[in-house]
Amino acid sequence: MDPCKFRPSSSFDTKTTTTNPGQPVWNDNEALTVGPRGPILLEDYHLLEKIAHFARDIPEPFVHAGRASAKGFFECTHDVTGLTCADFLPSPGAGTPVIVRFSTVIHERGSPETIRDPRGFAVKFYTREGNWDLLGNNFPVFFIRDGIKFPDVIHAFKPNPKSHVQEYWRVFDFLPHHPESLHTFFFLFDDVGIPTDYRHMDGFGVNTYTFVTRAGKSHYIKFHWRPTCGVSCLMDDEATLVGGKNHSHATQDLYDSIDAGNFPEWKLFVQVIDPEQQDRFDFDPLDDTKTWPEDLVPLQPVGRLVLDRNVDNFFNENEQLAFGPGLVVPGIYYSDDKMLQCRVFAYADTQRYRLGPNYLMLPVNAPKCGFKKNHYDGAMNFMHRDEEVDYYPSRHAPLRHAEPASFPVPTRPVVGKREKTRIKKENDFVQPGERYRSWAPDRQDRFVALRRRLAHPKVSHELRVIWIDFLSKCDKSCGMKVANRLNVKPSM
């Protein structure tokens, strides 16, 4: 038996403590010193190894640092073969193993899970044709529509670089330059801004993807996760009480529920738009700051997601769990959504920086199907290979391409000038206004009350006027209520 062919695991455990290379450790309580009170000796290899390893823990992610994961399966319940040739979405009944990561977006690891903050909802499908990562949030929209502004919007929400205190005046200073962000604000500062826990939370793909059939027919797709136990959220006073007792209440709720056999479940729905019909809407379907109205684009059921197993090791299956929207499978592809296009690179590059270039070899990230590639070298390459050819093509190792028909991609021609420009159909105020008017009066009042952050001394009178102008364009009564609270006369 060649031990090099097997990854280290708990099956190699010994009855006694060892160093990383396997030498016995006869004392893990005291460092090696000259006498009982003398200086520590550098020859204490175990001490040096222990401290050096501890000091080299991987950094926490810049976003989605607070996270909880669980494993389970996805089962197709409805036939969608007319929309996609994805191997794991055939006729009803097919099951696919998954791992799901829930997270808070902005705040650091260990922050209360009751903070008003978007929540991440990421699913990794281990399909027979590779891994598919569906990354989303608990809101269907995002703050900006162009990925070039992603670092800026995250910096605006992150703590002040001088004081390291999160201050909302920075947010209210930045976002007026991007009125498309209003729609997400009407979610974040609404009653749904603080989910009760992860089990009672919606999930949305946010970006527009593409389903492709074997014949090459494409459809634009939006993904929706709906919890079978319903959506539940916390009011501010409830969040303060819950978070004060337990900073990790949502993580504990998820773990304890699965441990008790109360398995969380979500239904997956899609919205479908034929690209040939996209011009009939008063918004751009590729704009991730917009929702697709369900009365015009109804939800279609696809399947169900069940989480029935907790992770075995938090670090291995949570901290090292890496997602990226670039991971798609035959039958599912990207769209020209500007935010999605940037995320395809950004997420993978983040993982290479944080986990190393071979992060997809880590067991939690590796595909469960067969695979063959030629880029193995680099840090943390622990896969045993014994071939002589690591290039393509070669007559010594007759590897061949997959058939083009096995991975159809959209073939729509694209013509245009090279330019940096905004999309034509911005229409930033209609959908936030419709959402506001759909609320009961008390819910509207709670939303308006959260605008008290506009009273911060660093939010200038000019900024307050701009915000009131934007809110008035969404809904005149909303703008008037905020203006009255701030004692500011609206400009319209």
UniProtKB/Swiss-Prot annotation:
CDD domains: catalase_clade_1 (cd08154). The keyword Heme applies. Its EC number is 1.11.1.6. It is an enzyme of class 1 (oxidoreductase). It is found in: Cytoplasm, Cytosol; Peroxisome matrix. One of its GO terms (cellular component) is plasma membrane. This is Catalase.
